[in-house]
Curated annotation (Swiss-Prot):
This is tRNA modification GTPase MnmE. K(+) binds at residues 226, 245, 247, 250. It is found in: Cytoplasm. Pfam families: MMR_HSR1 (PF01926), MnmE_helical (PF12631), TrmE_N (PF10396). NCBIfam families: mnmE_trmE_thdF, PRK05291.1-3, small_GTP. SUPFAM superfamilies: P-loop containing nucleoside triphosphate hydrolases, TrmE connector domain. GO terms for molecular function: GTP binding; GTPase activity; metal ion binding.
Length: 454
């Protein structure tokens, strides 16, 4: 297998459909056109032609599109054949194309990888293709499209350019210490560094929003049996996703629902009631519940308001609180306010949010929705924006750390060499986002997660 091979893959989903598309990219795309179509179509024009087998018989008839390199998606010669979407027809056509020497089936994401390697896309834009396909909401799709069109990359490149300019001044001061202007001590470097830090903080804030749009928030509903966990899941989902009865221990396994709150994806997980298990099935369910709790972004600690007047989680169930991960955020949800007569709404207690509601009637559930949105810092009024992955956030955080360390070197010891090194490392972190500085291993992991025909 070589990167110089001509590759072919189905670009439409497998199965039956009105249209099926095969995409070919590489040096032999021209030969495929001449062999299967009998001619080379006019560049970038739709040509209605028969698709022929080796014996001259017609396999299908459809649209052929020819994009000679470098003016194509991959930067190579690209041919697209758009025929009927039957799996048998597409399979026959694919087998016909693969009889031509030098062609092979594309790896997942290989078309996008070639576009990146041929400077048609940077890495953030290439990732945005997969994110656009996987978008679960309108806002996520729009943000992915912004990333594909270069919005995120432009912000990152602006930061890289600013750091390059800053490094020039710092390294000039190091290399020419006898010059009249001392760049390190006249305040210019500090002012420029502060500007870059402020710009980076703004990008980090937008990236966190973009990460929420892409990844969503994992919320686990946990508590004792019959506290109303499944009723709350149904109320948040807006449908009867879970069976609700008065029998304690009805929920034996993990139930998952994916919803959106004003565009923010929310992964809600209902778990088995936590208690001493009465049988092996319940024990396994409780064990899975704890596994989900430990991986949550937030836990909704469900409390049956008819069984206790306590509001402090450590007082309600100290053993449960003691077992939770130290930094895991908790929201105490006192349920059954329709029975207890408690005032609906939210308050703060010892660093925890406390919400009183009725999962059965739905009263107070909107307060919980708003709380979940605000607790993650999600901005529904965000204009534009872009999607961000975990690796993007990590690179931005590392760059911010290096800039803060560089600032400390500047203000503390005026150590120009150490400042220059911190600036270089920050620049390297940012360049990893767009692929200007990226390991082959990372590229392999990123593109292998794409669809076959992308």
């Amino acid at each position: 297998m070589s990167d110089n091979d001509t590759i072919v893959a189905q670009a439409t989903p497998p199965g039956r459909g009105g249209v099926g598309i095969l995409r070919i990219s590489g040096l032999k795309a021209r030969e495929v056109a001449e062999t299967v179509l009998g001619k080379l179509p006019k560049p970038r024009y739709a040509d209605y032609l028969p698709f022929k087998d080796a014996d001259g018989s017609v396999l299908d008839q459809g649209i052929a599109l020819w994009f000679p390199g470098p003016n194509s998606f991959t930067g190579e010669d690209v041919l697209e054949l758009q025929g009927h979407g039957g799996p048998v027809i597409l399979d026959l056509l694919l087998k016909r194309i693969l009889t031509i020497p030098g062609l092979r089936i594309a790896r997942p994401g290989e078309f996008s990888e070639r576009a990146f390697l041929n400077d048609k896309l940077d890495l953030a834009q290439a990732e945005a293709i997969a994110d656009l396909i996987d978008a679960s909401s309108e806002q996520a799709a729009r943000s992915a499209l912004n990333s594909l069109q270069g919005a995120f990359s432009a912000r990152v490149n602006h930061l890289v350019e600013a750091l390059t300019h800053l490094r020039i001044y710092v390294e000039a001061a190091i290399d020419f210490p006898d010059e009249e202007i001392d760049f390190l001590s006249d305040g210019k470097i500090e002012a420029q560094l502060n500007d870059v830090i402020a710009d980076l903080d703004a990008v980090r804030a937008e990236a966190r929003q973009g990460s929420l749009l892409r990844e969503g928030m994992k919320v686990v509903i946990a508590g004792r049996p019959n506290a109303g966990k499944s009723s709350l899941l149904n109320a948040l989902a807006g449908r009867e996703a879970a069976i609700v009865t008065d029998i304690a221990g009805t929920t034996r396994d993990v139930l998952r629902e994916h919803i959106h709150i004003d565009g923010m994806p929310l992964h809600i997980i209902d778990t088995a009631g936590l208690r001493e298990a009465s049988d092996e099935v319940e024990r396994i369910g409780i064990e899975r519940a704890w596994q989900e709790i430990e991986q949550a972004d937030r836990v909704l600690f469900m409390v049956d308001g008819t069984t206790t007047d306590a509001v402090d989680p450590a007082e309600i169930w100290p053993e449960f609180i003691a077992r939770l991960p130290a930094k895991l955020p908790i929201t105490v949800v006192r349920n059954k306010a329709d029975i207890t007569g408690e005032t609906l709404g939210m308050s703060e207690l010892n660093g925890h949010a406390l919400i009183r509601l009725s999962a059965r009637t739905g009263e107070g559930v909107d307060v919980l929705r708003n709380h979940l949105k605000q607790s993650m810092g999600f901005d529904t009024n965000m204009e534009g924006g872009f999607l961000a992955r975990r690796r993007h956030l990590q690179a931005l955080e590392q760059a911010a750390e290096h800039l803060q360390q560089g600032k400390a070197q500047l203000l503390g010891a005026w150590a120009g060499e150490l400042l220059a090194e911190e600036l270089r490392l920050a620049q390297q972190n940012l360049s990893e986002i767009t692929g200007e500085f990226t390991s082959d291993d990372l590229l392999g992991r990123i593109f292998s997660s794409f669809c076959i025909g992308k």
